[in-house]
């Protein structure tokens, strides 16, 4: 696996801060990396993103483990992560991965949440049968990372940023049932220009 560089200059940390916020890392792991409950439907489905400060699950990650977890959805022990949108992050450029990880590593060590993946029994059965795939099974692990694109309002940069939307909203952003989600989850919205469909944005 490709290791991640540990660079800590101010420009790196600032770019990492931007990516952490704009690529939805904080939605699952919290603004300070201490973990966050982001799904609780009151009917048996509860999902908590783990603490990723130096006091959490990533404390002993060597550089290559960050690449495996973020880009490939694979734990250091080789097992797939059940809830980690690595198909979104698989196309990260090396440059962006190399600024995101140092930003996360500079969080102050704090006590926080452990990962929770509470799903109804039927969902576990479907997962066991392969009907609900994890991210690792949906990724082309041989695909090279994206090449850097210049920041700005351009088609190339928009396509790169939209990689973060495809996993839920589909390759054409038309929405529909979210791949790998339990059957009773709401559909993702159609977010194509000029459309206003119901669904989860």
Model segments located where?
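Electrostatic cytochrome c docking/interface patches
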Residues: 2-21, 131-162
